[in-house]
Amino acid sequence: MNLDQYLPVLLFILVGIGVGVVPLLLGYVLGPNRPDPAKNSPYECGFEAFEDARMKFDVRYYLVAILFILFDLEIAFLFPWAVTLQEVGVTGFVAVLVFLAILVVGFAYEWKKGALNWE
């Protein structure tokens, strides 16, 4: 197995990592670090913080976000299939129907469990 052909790829990856990491390290090493009470104090729109910034966040927002990502990815997988519909034939069509059936069953399950109700 000849690995010489992968040397440019390895070099490209190393240069890319170096371009990202070297400026960060230089800024950390060469940058001034003089903390004082004004810099370490919490700042909120020009005023001192009124209360603790950590507040409870409703879990339903996370659930909606996860469901959005799930069904958004479904659409992202359907676009390439729609473009190559003529080439994939009946086998590709059946595969996408199975994919959509699984997602519809999952959506119906979420609906039945009440995950989409905001009450």
UniProtKB/Swiss-Prot annotation:
The keyword Cell inner membrane applies. The keyword Transmembrane applies. GO terms for molecular function: NADH dehydrogenase (ubiquinone) activity; NADH:ubiquinone reductase (non-electrogenic) activity; quinone binding. InterPro entries: NAD(P)H_OxRDtase_bac/plastid (IPR023043), NADH_UbQ/plastoQ_OxRdtase_su3 (IPR000440), NDAH_ubi_oxred_su3_sf (IPR038430). It is an enzyme of class 7 (translocase). Its EC number is 7.1.1.-. GO terms for cellular component: NADH dehydrogenase complex; plasma membrane. Its main location: membrane. It is a multi-pass membrane protein. The chain crosses the membrane at residues 9-29, 63-83, 88-108. It catalyses: a quinone + NADH + 5 H(+)(in) = a quinol + NAD(+) + 4 H(+)(out). It is found in: Cell inner membrane. Keywords: Cell inner membrane, Cell membrane, Membrane, NAD, Quinone, Translocase, Transmembrane, Transmembrane helix, Transport, Ubiquinone. Belongs to the complex I subunit 3 family. NDH-1 shuttles electrons from NADH, via FMN and iron-sulfur (Fe-S) centers, to quinones in the respiratory chain. The immediate electron acceptor for the enzyme in this species is believed to be ubiquinone. Couples the redox reaction to proton translocation (for every two electrons transferred, four hydrogen ions are translocated across the cytoplasmic membrane), and thus conserves the redox energy in a proton gradient. NDH-1 is composed of 14 different subunits. Subunits NuoA, H, J, K, L, M, N constitute the membrane sector of the complex. This is NADH-quinone oxidoreductase subunit A. It comes from Acidovorax sp. (strain JS42).
